Amino acid sequence: MKRDFTLFDIKSTLDYGCGGSDWSLKGFDESSNGSAKEFFRLDKCYRFEPARDLDERQKVDCVLNFDVLEHIFIADISNVINEIFSYAAKLVVINVACYPAGALLPNGENAHITVRSPDWWKAQVDNIALRYPDISVLLITSTGYMVSQAFPIYKANDWLNGNKFITTT
């Protein structure tokens, strides 16, 4: 992602569904003991985590969303993805798990309540990306612990202004 942040000149981020993460904490980069903010050369890092009453949502260069969407009820997925895009000026990075979690909810159900294939998630993100044609997208899907697939970075404008009807990314 460091290369992508440089390529898109990312200076500000919103970690949408950040849990307890803090991009300003030292120790992210083992070689320098620097923070993620320093490692990625960011000016501003904002966080959103409704479970912790943390809401710094605002327009930024890049919105990051890791291990969140699979915890969202299927009927709400498109609204959440749309909101993620609405805060991005340049890039959206989504990582979604496509397998059951190791944890259960208090009612006994799996914590990953929307487990779908990588292609299903790609279709959901593509559908919303069409509403934000100038925003680039990096979608990473995980089919197991430490097993992931990154789709090529794209933006819907490439499809809309292309000379072909078939899209392959």
Task: Show which residues each predicted segment covers.
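Conserved alpha-helix/loop element of class I SAM-dependent methyltransferases that forms part
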Residues: 1-10
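Conserved class I S-adenosyl-L-methionine
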Residues: 10-20
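Residue-level micro-sites within transmembrane alpha helices that shape
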Residues: 14, 69-70
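S-adenosyl-L-methionine-dependent methyltransferase catalytic module, highlighting the catalytic core
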Residues: 20-26, 40-41, 51-60, 64-65, ...
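Conserved S-adenosyl-L-methionine
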Residues: 29-35, 40-43
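Conserved SAM-binding motif I beta-strand of class I
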Residues: 44-48
